[in-house]
Regions:
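Conserved, single-site charged/polar hotspot
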Residues: 1-177
């Protein structure tokens, strides 16, 4: 249903279209099948908790993706007899964050690990964006309702890191966090 955002259909179609969105058809067979198992498990995990999985579906899946998904459809990842939480995303800046930092819930099988292939496969890995201090001043002052000092080097101070070396907290010119 377009207005409610609810999609219904058979599992093969939904998982195939999810896989098509996440990895497309350019990866090797085993990578596509692994994504299919993760997507299927994610949907079943949500259903088992009385929730609806949030997935993005391609308009259609290629015949190759559909065929590979069909080979593994129904296979799932379990932890202690229940469907595992199998969140997925394209890149993690070289290291994942633990579930406890992302979801505020500990899943012992979702710990921070190095992801050395991000640099090889993520087109944005290592990219940088630059903004003028005037632009940043305007955006920050407008959003936070504060007046920044004259020294841009004081505007952002990291006060704590989480696992994966992600920023856990920061101070904005000593006035907001």
């Amino acid at each position: 249903d377009y207005y409610s955002g609810t999609i219904s259909g058979d599992a093969l179609d939904i998982v195939s279209r999810t896989v098509m969105t996440e990895v497309g058809s350019g990866f090797n067979d085993e990578a596509i099948k692994a994504q299919a198992v993760a997507a299927y498990t994610n949907i079943k995990n949500n259903e088992s908790r009385g929730s609806t999985a949030s997935v993005i579906l391609a308009p259609q899946a290629s015949s190759r993706v559909r065929s590979l998904v069909k080979e593994v459809l129904g296979q799932a990842v379990y932890y202690n007899g229940s469907y595992a939480l199998t969140t997925y995303y394209a890149s993690s800046a070289g290291r994942t964050a633990s579930a406890s930092n992302v979801f505020n819930t500990d899943y012992p099988y979702l710990e921070s690990v190095e992801t050395p292939f991000d640099a090889e496969y993520d087109q944005y890995y290592g990219s940088e964006s630059y903004f003028s201090s005037d632009y940043m001043r305007s955006a920050i002052e407008s959003y936070y309702g504060i007046t920044l000092s004259s020294n841009p080097e004081n505007w952002f101070v990291i006060t704590a890191y989480e696992d994966g070396q992600y920023v856990g907290s920061m101070s904005i010119d000593g006035q907001a966090s």
